[in-house]
């Protein structure tokens, strides 16, 4: 089979298409998926530059999520599932033509949804659901601020929060504001403007994938009883090679921004969210991907795909994501 391989740490050009052995027959409880689209996430970028500690050793195939067709099943899985269109969490290995995954980590792909849209669901929508509902305890009428609102998780959060009756504000560059408004954002905010945060809030929930200096500001925008869900560190992106020296200021800014005593006094909650860690602990994505079945079938979850990029052009997919040019999901297609 063909796969996109991180051959060494560095810029997008280190991504190469390589022939690799097909996976073995699916084990008990597994299915084999012929991949039609694979999601690209910021964690993949961090793995490529050497700043993602959970990434497999090089040369490696990353990719957390795919959509495709089941072509074989292991013992204990209904043989009738062969031929089923599914989306799936892959726990690495998604940038490939074939993957084996646990059957519990798959969800039927609605006929109305393309494979490219399906590949936008397993990471982005489970993260958004966990942040808003699983841990954020979102209630109707609450005010939510979504950083990086035009990204994959950002758009998923907008859709799920609006469906729950929340008022949603989102940060993005000005060129993306019209699209965010069409997606339902009540107020689009230009984060590049000096003092953009002044006069905003207080918010019940802030979703922060930026980290670094953004962490403290997000905390300051919460009302008492508010919840900050931190699920990313895109501020670590400093060039195309691993540099702890360049990343250190952002890491230190997060430490300076947090004090348990202050959070207790202000009655504010900080929630760290790492879907891979939850997945490892539970052994399945089902607690988070399962509740999305209804949202997928009724159109509440309607993934937006910015670009579907062939495997051979994988460096361009990573470049788009790193440059923050996308509104919605970037996916790879074999």
PLM feature spans:
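N-terminal glycine-rich beta->alpha transition that marks the start or flank
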Residues: 10-13, 20-67
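Mid-domain Rossmann-like dinucleotide-binding core that forms the NAD(H)/NADP(H) cofactor-binding site
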Residues: 81, 121, 125-193
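Glycine-rich phosphate-binding loop and adjacent beta-alpha segment
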Residues: 214-298
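C-terminal hydrophobic helical "lid"/dimerization subdomain
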Residues: 279-334
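A short acidic, Gly/Pro-enriched loop at the edge of an enzyme's catalytic core
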Residues: 198-205
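Short glycine-centered segments of the SAM/dcSAM-binding site in methyltransferase folds
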Residues: 85, 143, 167, 226-227, ...
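A glycine-/small-residue-rich N-terminal strand-loop-strand element
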Residues: 47, 67-91
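A structural motif shared across PLP-dependent enzymes of the aminotransferase-like
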Residues: 90-103
């Amino acid at each position: 089979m063909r796969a996109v391989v991180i051959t060494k740490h560095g810029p997008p050009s280190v991504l190469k298409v390589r022939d690799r052995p097909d996976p073995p027959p699916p084990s008990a409880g597994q299915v084999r998926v012929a991949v039609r689209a694979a999601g690209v996430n910021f964690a993949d970028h961090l793995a490529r530059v050497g700043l993602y500690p959970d990434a497999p050793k090089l040369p490696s195939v990353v990719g957390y999520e795919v959509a495709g067709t089941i072509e074989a099943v292991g013992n204990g899985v209904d043989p009738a599932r062969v031929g089923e269109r599914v989306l799936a969490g892959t726990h690495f290995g998604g940038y490939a033509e074939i993957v084996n995954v646990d059957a519990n980590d798959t969800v039927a792909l609605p006929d109305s949804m393309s494979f490219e849209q399906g590949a936008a669901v397993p990471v982005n929508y489970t993260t958004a659901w966990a942040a808003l509902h699983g841990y954020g305890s979102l209630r109707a009428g609450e005010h939510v601020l979504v950083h990086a609102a035009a990204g994959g998780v950002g758009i998923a959060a907008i859709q799920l929060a609006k469906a729950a009756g929340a008022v949603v504000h989102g940060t993005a560059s000005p060129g993306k504001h019209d699209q965010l408004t069409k997606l339902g954002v009540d107020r689009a905010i230009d984060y590049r403007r000096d003092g953009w945060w002044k006069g905003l809030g207080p918010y019940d929930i802030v979703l922060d994938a930026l980290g670094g200096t953004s962490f403290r500001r997000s905390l300051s925008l919460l009302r008492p009883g508010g919840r900050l869900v931190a699920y990313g560190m895109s501020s670590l992106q400093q060039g195309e090679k691993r540099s702890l020296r360049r990343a250190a200021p952002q890491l230190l800014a997060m430490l300076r921004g947090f004090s348990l005593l202050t959070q207790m006094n202000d009655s504010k909650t900080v929630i760290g969210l790492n879907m891979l860690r939850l997945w490892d602990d539970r052994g399945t994505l089902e607690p988070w991907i399962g509740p999305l079945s209804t949202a997928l079938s009724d159109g509440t979850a309607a993934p937006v795909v910015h670009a579907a990029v062939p495997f051979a052009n994988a460096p361009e997919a990573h470049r788009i994501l790193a440059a923050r040019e996308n509104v919605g999901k970037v996916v790879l297609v074999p």
